[in-house]
Amino acid sequence: MNFAEREGSKRYCIQTKHVAILCAVVVGVGLIVGLAVGLTRSCDSSGDGGPGTAPAPSHLPSSTASPSGPPAQDQDICPASEDESGQWKNFRLPDFVNPVHYDLHVKPLLEEDTYTGTVSISINLSAPTRYLWLHLRETRITRLPELKRPSGDQVQVRRCFEYKKQEYVVVEAEEELTPSSGDGLYLLTMEFAGWLNGSLVGFYRTTYTENGQVKSIVATDHEPTDARKSFPCFDEPNKKATYTISITHPKEYGALSNMPVAKEESVDDKWTRTTFEKSVPMSTYLVCFAVHQFDSVKRISNSGKPLTIYVQPEQKHTAEYAANITKSVFDYFEEYFAMNYSLPKLDKIAIPDFGTGAMENWGLITYRETNLLYDPKESASSNQQRVATVVAHELVHQWFGNIVTMDWWEDLWLNEGFASFFEFLGVNHAETDWQMRDQMLLEDVLPVQEDDSLMSSHPIIVTVTTPDEITSVFDGISYSKGSSILRMLEDWIKPENFQKGCQMYLEKYQFKNAKTSDFWAALEEASRLPVKEVMDTWTRQMGYPVLNVNGVKNITQKRFLLDPRANPSQPPSDLGYTWNIPVKWTEDNITSSVLFNRSEKEGITLNSSNPSGNAFLKINPDHIGFYRVNYEVATWDSIATALSLNHKTFSSADRASLIDDAFALARAQLLDYKVALNLTKYLKREENFLPWQRVISAVTYIISMFEDDKELYPMIEEYFQGQVKPIADSLGWNDAGDHVTKLLRSSVLGFACKMGDREALNNASSLFEQWLNGTVSLPVNLRLLVYRYGMQNSGNEISWNYTLEQYQKTSLAQEKEKLLYGLASVKNVTLLSRYLDLLKDTNLIKTQDVFTVIRYISYNSYGKNMAWNWIQLNWDYLVNRYTLNNRNLGRIVTIAEPFNTELQLWQMESFFAKYPQAGAGEKPREQVLETVKNNIEWLKQHRNTIREWFFNLLESG
């Protein structure tokens, strides 16, 4: 699953106990205060335009409204029960019951928004029992289950019931079932019915418009625990089985599933039954089927496999790039892994409303449209890179995840960390000039180091015991930290050994399940190095070290935490928060390495190749290791001087690494902020994408803390306006250059606008006005900048309404997303309030985009408090619409991360106390509370130092 748009659902309401009236009053007062703060800005925020009226949203049938009632069926066939007399009270399924094959048939009734189905499961039983239990949620059993012995004799079923606490349906036989013998299998048959609306998980319907006509598509999304919403199943990843799937669908529709079509049969004049070939053994979360009226774009792999993309007919041309990148990366992975793709075909389909970024269903990958469809005339370079990386990510899964699957969700990183790492290798092969190996620093390594320096982080391998906990581990630690440590590991054991180990692992465990230790064993065999001993320290405890350099060559390690007040020994770790570290360094262009063993408590001394022994050792070149490095102040000063004299002394990745380390160390009170800020003095000569991205990230934190500081904020603005101006002027407001240059231009022009540069803002406003007047077609790589900063600088009600009209008119999802950001950037609280109200209009704002819009509004200084207050006021609505198991709902509370006052912290704590059931949002709540507490302390500790640096700089001219 691609998580970058960062997003299973249970459709039930959670009853919560309200806290004392006083707490409710506190939250209420906080909301009033927050709204009042926003309203004080409304006087001058309407711009110079006259009154306007928002266009009426197009009234399309809603595809994801809450279901009005259950499908027609007998609700009492398998009634809910609290019977806890058996093992079904346990969260995990028993080892003695294992599915071998599913015959699954479904029939979607599109006009009724319901579906019916039948599943017959062949079961191997290794111990006697009278009970069989498997997963089921929301979908209902419509007929008493049937059970047959291996002999074919019928077994009388006494009763069935739902044990909702663990999402099971339990079937009780009249007599004991004896263990299977030989090839004999029990056969359990269940008929069921479910809803197609109200959710973006399980089996659901959504709509799109073609030539003015509203059309429907139905599809599935099952990871991690939502196959049970579509059909009764043993919904755990190590319960692999084969599947024969059939779908009865309207004749004018086509059907897709994991496997190729085996046969199509006419049922009557309205219905066709499509049956698919028997699958290979696979986990339930990979089962997929869809019913559609799409066109296709096809390629053939070097090994002869058909690679097909299904897309709305009007958008067929936008699938060409994805088709090309699919073939290139697919061929590369078949060669790299030395293993052919396992199925006869690979399909992809763009779903108009899709809750995650993409889903790697074996043989039928589903995508959000923004991650598959690219129009070179309308999409930006960043959109193209996004399509390429998501396509590559999902292709990796066809090997890591599908052929070999983690045994349990605690090892999710074996799927997602690997896909996040290899996506860069795949795109690097297909797009050789994109610097994808270096971009891994920007996308994964450095961002997740911030997450992993919190006390509320978690180990890569983490115990999960509920569906909510399973959902919550689809986060930056599993994806980006997983990717980052694989990058370090590949470098340590050498790429050829890493590749060989991956091949051995896939060969040994194909069509099976594996654990992290199995992967370490394969790499140890390939490299003859103590991989498990080293890597356990990176996967079985949270966090990472900072290496302190004493003198020139002596280094010690210590856990790095952003909060200097935190206890570095908590929560307890068997490994004591020490790491076995592959340390690498360069000296006079000579690279050396050593393994820093955690048992060396006093540290180690690096061997110098320079006879004088005084040469500078650049430790962790290109930030290849997942750790930070803190030099002595004198060394940092020398680095600042070297950057000023000739910044190209260091590689672009090293410059990004040094800047990121310095600002992170300063934030953690391990380095004076003056030292970190000195590193930025050279930036007028910086022309590379990597360092600028990390500078912008570091500065964004500082300006978010001082946004309302009327003395200090203008000084920060003035300084960074000056630093970014040379590169901004050099690149200009055009769309020239190669791929990385276009990414750089978008970043630095956006930073210039963010810093209040009048020339940049005027350029954005001028282009915005020309776009409003229809006199110019905006360059694709400037559109987001113009929509955002043109709206921010000169937007009013008329321009806002026009932008909303364009959002409704365009069919390209990537353009819609940019326009949504533009709408969120207006400095007018009345329009922002209207925008927030539109989030409940499912005909206008797709279910997949609601949290995206809230986040965009929170980036607006006028909308920061409004977005947070809207979440609080509409929490019950959001829970009912998305459920607490939705990871996007759980994470939306992180929009409060820039908060930095005791009042804001109090409001957050009161809100969480009022709604204590967090579902998949437990960790995000911990993280945002920790971050806000850190922010409050940060202001106390660092304001004067930072003020002094900027004041002295401006005083000296």
Swiss-Prot record:
The keyword Glycoprotein applies. Its cofactor is Zn(2+). Glycans are attached at residues 98, 124, 197, 324, 340, 554, 589, 597, 607, 678, 763, 773, 801, 828. Residues 44-83 are annotated as: Disordered. Signal peptide: none annotated. Keywords: Aminopeptidase, Calcium, Cell membrane, Disulfide bond, Glycoprotein, Hydrolase, Membrane, Metal-binding, Metalloprotease, Protease, Signal-anchor, Transmembrane, Transmembrane helix, Zinc. Substrate binds at residues 223, 357-361, 887. This is Glutamyl aminopeptidase. It catalyses: Release of N-terminal glutamate (and to a lesser extent aspartate) from a peptide. Binds 1 zinc ion per subunit. Homodimer; disulfide-linked. Substrate specificity is modulated by calcium which enhances the enzymatic activity for cleavage of acidic residues while reducing its activity with basic residues. Inhibited by aminopeptidase inhibitors amastatin and bestatin. One of its GO terms (molecular function) is aminopeptidase activity. Its main location: membrane. InterPro entries: Aminopeptidase_N-like_N (IPR045357), Aminopeptidase_N-like_N_sf (IPR042097), ERAP1-like_C_dom (IPR024571), M1_APN-typ (IPR034016), Peptidase_M1 (IPR001930), Peptidase_M1_aminopeptidases (IPR050344), Peptidase_M1_dom (IPR014782), Peptidase_M4/M1_CTD_sf (IPR027268). Changing residue 887 to T: In a breast cancer sample; somatic mutation. The keyword DNA-binding does not apply. The active site is at 394 (proton acceptor). The record marks 479 as: Transition state stabilizer. Residues 1-18 are cytoplasmic. Its EC number is 3.4.11.7. It is a single-pass type II membrane protein. The record marks 221 as: Binds calcium which modulates its enzyme activity. The gene is ENPEP. It is found in: Cell membrane.
